[in-house]
């Protein structure tokens, strides 16, 4: 099948377009025995995820690293979602990755986004990249991207979005988005821009409901203010 055929096929394999869970993707990844040895930066938040990914991609590229970037949605071509060194990967590489996923998944159905996420990581692993920047699709805690532990987690903004899936308060939505932060993360980078949150609200309101080790480094940036480094 060509890429157009594959995309039509993967749209039909799962009954729901959005079905937040990590169970299915974990099963398929275990069967693929995918080895992810490069550092991962996961970028979540309500707005600004795509631009943040682009900035990080450019920084790493200019610094001489072989950088991979996975974003969504695409504008014209699916390939735009999966880039290495700022260049969209070929149809052939994506089709090869889809074929491997199809052979491994057996009875497990995957969403369109789950297929794309696994395909991206297969391609990045085989390309031996130095670092990968991954944009969260929806929320964070149960998003397919979050099956890969982030070495650095970036949360851009927290606002009321996708409330049917994430909750009806900023605290509930913040909990879901902050789910990309792992206790094992070597570096934690947080960019907070929450003008609707009262000024008396502590910067760490996102982290109240999740277990972050004391002493974890956090970078706080409020609007255009100079970022400040602190520890949780």
Regions found by a protein language model. Give the residues of each.
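Short functional linear segments
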Residues: 1-45, 52-54, 58, 62-63
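N-terminal-biased segments
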Residues: 1-20, 78, 134-136, 152-161
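ATP-dependent carboxylate-amine ligase catalytic core
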Residues: 16-18, 22, 26-36, 62-148, ...
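Hydrophobic/aromatic beta-strand patches that form the interior of the parallel beta-sheet core
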Residues: 41, 68-70, 152-154
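Conserved phosphate-binding and hydrolysis motifs of nucleotide-dependent enzymes
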Residues: 45-48, 135-137
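Short active-site-proximal "capping" loops at secondary-structure junctions
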Residues: 47-49, 74-75
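Acidic, Mg2+-coordinating active-site environments of NTP-dependent enzymes
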Residues: 128-135, 150-189, 196
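Short, strongly patterned local motifs
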Residues: 188-232
